[in-house]
């Protein structure tokens, strides 16, 4: 599988593979067995440029405040219980296996970054549209039977955008709460409290109680159990490995980990309660709805979109435009809807269709490479995943703390989720046909998405992402703008979008991003 990532100075391509699951015998704690996910690029040991002592006061997304979920005071560092915990760390370090040392190195680059990689791999694995049934029609993935055929979920672009946003937002609130309690109790790491313990991960003066590794693992495993239930075994093992690595490395004791795990799971429960009622369960609609959408377009005198799959496939999540956004109300979504596309009977539409045909018939090698680079179709981490991949490099190079990194991904992914909601609301409001529907002689260069054309999802996602990243990393603004434009035009090169789709999508994504940026400007983070 070919994934791509861009960075200032040009595109950087790298190959990643689907999750490789290695079997292991015995419990992870006992054996240190790595039921591995990856492979991923090596992350340098995390040595944050700031401890972010005020992060506990930064604005929450869903929690009412940093102390909403109580964390009991830890035992004193002079207590017999804590001394016994330190002895347990020393004992574990005296018998470390090479597998355990590899786990320490694997997680030492930061849990937020590592889990972001894992989520992208899960999206890629499950981003597979169901195959048609022998008798015709298509089966629907069932959350109640995630191991069935087809497996649940079908991690299409908007499912992926929602998944990235829930994981990132939950991690961010959980870590802000953890930071609040860390600086309430100020218990230093084991390696700081006992010089007989070797620091195998970079150790700072950041308080260790509750453990940020355990907080991240706890909140993430609970979110992913719901979002990717068929992967529950490997997700659970990776989360346990992260916590164990923190103990083996001398960064956390058992009570640091227990407190962090409980906090993370409690925060996840808040986010999962929201997810259960955000409208996603009914986003697929029904045949009656699908017909009504087509009839509405026809009644306006337009040619209605139809599926080009054989047999015709139901439209992809036509009610996703009604799924709850993070920083926009339903009224905001409607108010920001782009103006109508060119009429299907207009000269402009004829001209734009002709431009698509002319472009794909005279495609240069560079244009084809751009179309493929930004394809992000079935079997990949999706357009939102592409921007997460880009973002990881900037976060890594900035040496951000876990809570600062979580803020970046939360802002990015909330904006892209909201962009997906807004884009899908427009797509199914206008129900505009694809270029190859109006002119079947157009030969697309990439897969044809199974939903209406206007506006371009790539353009909307990319504009929202570029706007947020330009705020977070101002020095990269020109690069982000270039990637936004390249992602948009790639859809014309691929033969699947008109120019109007692209330009309207970019403008729409820019407007949607302002809602998340308003949150960011007032969240208290320096």
Model-identified regions with their sequence ranges:
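N-terminal secretory signal peptides that target proteins for export/translocation
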Residues: 1-14
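C-terminal motif of bacterial Sec signal peptides marking the signal peptidase cleavage site
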Residues: 29-32
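Sec-dependent signal peptide recognition
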Residues: 16-21
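Acidic/polar surface patches and capping/hinge elements
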Residues: 34-526
């Amino acid at each position: 599988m070919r994934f791509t990532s861009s960075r200032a100075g040009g595109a950087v391509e790298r190959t990643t593979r689907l999750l490789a699951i290695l079997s292991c015998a015995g419990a992870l704690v006992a054996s240190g067995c790595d039921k591995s996910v990856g492979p991923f690029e090596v992350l340098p040991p995390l040595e944050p440029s700031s401890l972010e002592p005020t992060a506990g006061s930064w604005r929450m997304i869903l929690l009412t405040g940093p102390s909403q979920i109580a964390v009991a005071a830890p035992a004193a560092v002079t207590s017999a219980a804590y001394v016994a915990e330190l002895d347990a760390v020393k004992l574990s370090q005296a018998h470390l296996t090479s597998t355990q040392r590899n786990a320490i190195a694997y997680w030492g680059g930061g849990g937020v970054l590592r889990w972001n990689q894992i989520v992208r791999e899960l999206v890629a694995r499950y981003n597979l549209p169901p195959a048609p049934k022998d008798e015709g029609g298509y089966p629907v993935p069932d959350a109640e039977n995630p191991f069935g055929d087809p497996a649940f979920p079908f991690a299409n672009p908007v499912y992926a955008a929602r998944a990235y946003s829930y994981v990132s937002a939950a991690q961010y609130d959980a870590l802000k709460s953890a930071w609040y309690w860390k600086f309430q109790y100020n218990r230093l790491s084991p390696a700081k409290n006992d010089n007989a313990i070797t620091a195998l991960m970079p150790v700072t003066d950041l308080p260790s109680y509750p453990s940020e590794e355990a907080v991240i693992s706890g909140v993430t495993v609970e979110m992913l159990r719901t979002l990717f239930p068929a992967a529950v075994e490997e997700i659970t093992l990776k989360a346990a490995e992260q916590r164990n690595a923190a103990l083996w490395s001398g960064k956390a004791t058992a009570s640091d980990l227990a407190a962090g795990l409980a906090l993370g799971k409690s925060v996840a429960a808040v986010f999962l309660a929201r997810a259960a009622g955000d409208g996603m369960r009914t986003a697929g609609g029904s045949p009656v709805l699908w017909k009504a959408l087509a009839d509405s377009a026809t009644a306006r005198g337009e040619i209605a979109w139809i599926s080009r799959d054989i047999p015709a496939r139901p439209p992809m999540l036509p009610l996703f435009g009604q799924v709850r956004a993070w920083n926009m109300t339903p009224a905001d979504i409607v108010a920001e809807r782009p103006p109508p596309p060119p009429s299907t009977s207009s000269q402009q539409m004829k001209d734009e269709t002709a431009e698509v045909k002319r472009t794909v018939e005279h495609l240069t090698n560079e244009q084809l490479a751009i179309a493929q680079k930004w394809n992000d179709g079935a079997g990949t981490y999706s357009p939102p995943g592409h921007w997460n991949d880009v973002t990881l490099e900037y976060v890594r190079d900035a040496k951000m703390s876990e809570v600062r990194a979580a803020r970046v991904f939360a802002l990015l992914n909330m904006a892209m989720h909201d962009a997906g909601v807004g884009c899908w609301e427009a797509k199914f409001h206008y129900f505009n046909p694809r270029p190859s529907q109006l002119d079947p002689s157009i030969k697309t260069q990439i897969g044809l998405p199974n939903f209406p054309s206007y506006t371009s999802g790539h353009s909307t996602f990319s504009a929202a992402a570029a706007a947020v990243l330009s705020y977070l990393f101002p020095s990269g603004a020109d690069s982000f703008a270039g990637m936004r434009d390249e992602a948009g035009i790639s859809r014309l090169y691929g033969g699947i979008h008109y120019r109007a789709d692209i330009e309207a999508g970019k403008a729409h994504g820019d407007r949607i991003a302002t809602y998340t940026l308003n949150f960011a400007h007032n969240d208290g983070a320096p």
